[in-house]
A protein has these predicted regions:
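Short proline/glycine- and acidic-rich turn/helix-capping motifs at secondary-structure junctions
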Residues: 262-268
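Low-complexity, glycine/alanine/valine/leucine- and proline-rich hydrophobic stretches
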Residues: 210, 214-259
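Generic structural signal for residues in well-ordered beta-strands
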Residues: 55, 258-261
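Helical "lid/coupling" subdomains associated with nucleotide-phosphate turnover
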Residues: 1-202, 206-211, 222-229, 235-238
């Protein structure tokens, strides 16, 4: 650990020396001395951009990073780190910042991914789109923190104004559109992937319209031209059924299958 002042002072000293002098003074090979100053310049630029006060020097260097990147691109080694989980954790923080209803969000997210998985042969979307669907479920109500009456537009603006590390600009825009169109009409030129994800999110969100998680045990199954949503819940789900109709109609327009809710009846 060293201060940025110490680092910049040391960098200025080394910058006046030749390659041979650096190799001798620091007891490194000539090859290592060759890249020392360019690397120091990169670190110096990072310090200027970030504005940090201290610099922690790990046991790895830029050469290790270059070698790692090359090996991964050639499938020589596999990185076991789950970068998707990093993105999910970051979005959890965004949701928390805008006072999202955690229980409702997690329930809608669970329903959405179940629908995605059971219909994967129909929509043909990838794991990356599945991740965007999860993120949309986690942020679908963030705009309510700013405005209840204009929540969809506020949600869109929040997402577009927030840099989410791990998502490209196009993916972030796709995420923002799915969240926006969850409750508002779509533009005619809307991307097909956005339409497919929005159809799933609308159905999942409608299944917890009361925010009381009445259908905890629901299961999803494709039968002929229907997406059957079965539940043994003893709760009154009249609200969910009533507000489910138009969401189901849109889903049917997109996928050609009709979502139907089937609640097991209990003898009183």
């Amino acid at each position: 650990l060293m201060t940025t002042e110490d680092f910049m002072g040391r960098y200025k000293q080394l910058n006046t020396k030749s390659q041979d002098e650096l190799a001798k003074e620091l007891q490194v090979t000539s090859e290592q001395a060759t890249i020392l100053i360019p690397c120091a310049r990169i670190y110096g630029r990072f310090i200027e951009v970030v504005g940090c006060k201290n610099l922690w020097v790990p046991g790895t260097d830029i050469c290790d990073g270059v070698a790692m990147d090359y090996a991964m691109s050639r499938k020589k080694i596999m990185d076991k780190h789950n970068f998707d989980e990093d993105i999910l954790n970051e979005v959890r923080g965004i949701s928390k910042r805008y006072k999202g209803n955690t229980v409702h969000i997690q329930f809608v997210r669970s329903l959405a991914v179940q629908i995605f998985d059971v219909t994967k042969k129909i929509h043909g979307l990838s794991k990356r789109e599945r991740l965007i669907l999860e993120l949309a479920a986690m942020l679908h109500d963030c705009g309510k923190y700013i405005s209840i009456h204009n929540a969809a537009e506020c949600s869109y603006n929040i997402i577009m104004a927030t840099e989410i590390i791990g998502l490209s600009h196009r993916e972030r825009e796709m995420l923002a559109q799915v969240v926006k169109y969850n409750t508002t009409p779509m533009e005619p030129e809307t991307d097909l992937t956005v339409i497919k994800l929005t159809a799933i999110l609308r159905v999942a969100n409608a299944l917890d319209r009361s925010h009381k998680q009445k259908m905890q045990d629901c299961r999803f199954e494709l039968k002929d031209s229907e997406l059957v949503i079965s539940t043994k819940s003893k709760e009154d789900i009249a609200l969910e059924k009533g507000l489910f109709v138009d969401k189901a109609e849109f889903f049917e327009e997109v996928y050609g299958i009709k979502p139907v809710i089937r609640q097991k009846k209990f003898n009183v």
